[in-house]
Amino acid sequence: MHILWIAYFGLIAACSLIGAALCGLGLRQLPWLKRTEPVRNDHAPSISIIFAARDEAEKLPAALPTLLAQTYSDYEVVAVNDRSRDATLDILNQFARASKLLRVCNVTELPPKWLGKTHALDAGYRVARGEWLLFTDADVCFTPDVLSRAMALAEARGWDHLTLLAGIEMHGVWEIAAISYFGMVFVAGNGIWHINRPRSRAYNGVGAFQLVRREAYERSGGHKRLALEVIDDMKLGKIIKLAGFRSGTGVAFDEVRVRWQSGVRNVIAGVTKNMFAALGYNVMLAAGALLPPLAFSITPLLGVILATGWARVFAGIALATVLAMHAFVLGHAGQSPFYALTDPLGAILFDWMISRSVIVTLWQGGVKWRDTFYPLDELRKNMV
């Protein structure tokens, strides 16, 4: 039995070292927004910033002013109130009276065969005037030169679609463990640097920042094609790639900021609708997704504590490598590398988030989102 543990931890250590090397090389290939010179205003195509807001009265007063304070010469902001029950619409109208940059679109009903968010973003697109469309969320904050630098980056690389990785504010050990591990899996596990290669089939999209050429958006089908996609942000990147357009990912941890969820319970609740959807509502894929955190983060820690001899040595190498890779990703994200020590806890939480998403979705027979229920059969039939 001891020789089997030596072989197991030796394999995990080797895979960890190779993965860490590939991750390090890959992350260095991603362009950083802060290193991009802003576009010249006399060469700036028009941009429409579009976001949907449902019951966002608490967060809008902090985020919306940053969208209206851009140094870019030709842009507008289209805010879509999606059937809010709080003061969201009043706040939007108040800002619109103070700024000619802001236009408010009010959605009062949700048509059949649409998710609320995708319908609201589609409604925003239909009134937007820009040559480029920037989809974001109602709680995201921008620095004043984000548009100028993002457009310069997209044009310099010849991209039709640019996703920026945002900085996420985190507080408390449990929240840090859950979000930082989720972020590491998203960045390192998915190998997002492959997206920037034209021949790669890899795709990406995050709700905080997606800048897309209007032609690419329309020819790919836009949010109408994603009407029942729970992870519409990721799938927008997919359909743009499928339509033959060029897509890229950049880093804007300082320039684009968001407080994703407050507290670990809200983090777990917030991804319950997403995790199973990201795995195509496939139970076997979900079961397989539980294995990497178990193999690379949890069992090496147990090996260091419980194993002996070479098995413990290899377990230690595997654990140290994963912690170093986690610290490297956190450091690039402007977070303390010491948060990497929460990696095994984050792995446990990550596996629980997947398991909970599968169990809740199957138990309910679908997804409940913002007081609306969407049957699982219908969601599966309309996946891109």
PLM segments and residue spans:
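Acidic donor-binding segment of Leloir-type glycosyltransferases
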Residues: 64-111
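Short, well-formed alpha-helical segments that are part of the catalytic scaffolds
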Residues: 31-35, 56-69
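Long helical/loop segments within the catalytic core of UDP-sugar-dependent glycosyltransferases
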Residues: 26-29, 103-126, 149-219, 224, ...
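Catalytic donor/gating beta->alpha subdomain of glycosyltransferases that bind UDP-sugars
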Residues: 154, 158-188, 215-218, 223-285, ...
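N-terminal membrane-anchoring/stem segments of glycan-assembly enzymes
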Residues: 1-41, 180, 192
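Cell-envelope/extracellular polymer assembly enzymes that use nucleotide-activated donors
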Residues: 45-48, 76
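Acidic donor-binding/catalytic loop of UDP-sugar-dependent glycosyltransferases
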Residues: 87, 136-153
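Membrane-embedded multi-pass helical conduit in multi-pass membrane proteins
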Residues: 41, 285-365
